[in-house]
Amino acid sequence: MYKIMLCCSAGMSPSLLVRKMVDAAKERDLPVQIDAYGVAEFDMQFPQYQVVLLGPQVKYMLKMLSEKAAPLNIPVQPIDTMDYGMQRGDNVLNYALSLIAAAH
């Protein structure tokens, strides 16, 4: 199962994107767990996931969050702003899967 965490300022804004990513995974019969959290929950949640994607609101925290996740070999990367804004769940899912593949 692929475990993907989305992180934004409060954990609420990516909920539609999570749904679209799950739908895209179902179309391909991919087993996924995709959850969204606020950045305040990052430290407690990220070890459970294979990749963390950051929403545009918290992209400025990339360096700090990446450094926290690096010892566990968990990639942390920002979501493409256009894909986020247009809610392109399939593109974001593809990006997450490529990061997981590159890290493992």
Please give the residue ranges for each predicted region.
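Conserved active-site segments centered on acidic
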Residues: 2-39
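Ser/Thr/Gly-rich flexible loops in soluble cytosolic domains mediating phosphotransfer, phosphorylation
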Residues: 3, 75-104
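Short, surface-exposed alpha-helical segments at coil->helix boundaries
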Residues: 15-19, 59-66
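A short, gly/pro- and small-residue-rich
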Residues: 61-81
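Short acidic active-site motifs
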Residues: 38-42, 61
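Short, well-ordered alpha-helices that flank and scaffold nucleotide-derived cofactor binding pockets
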Residues: 19, 23, 67, 94, ...
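Short glycine-rich anion-binding loops that position phosphate/pyrophosphate groups of nucleotides
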Residues: 10, 57-59
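Short acidic/histidine-rich motifs immediately flanking catalytic phosphotransfer sites
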Residues: 46-52
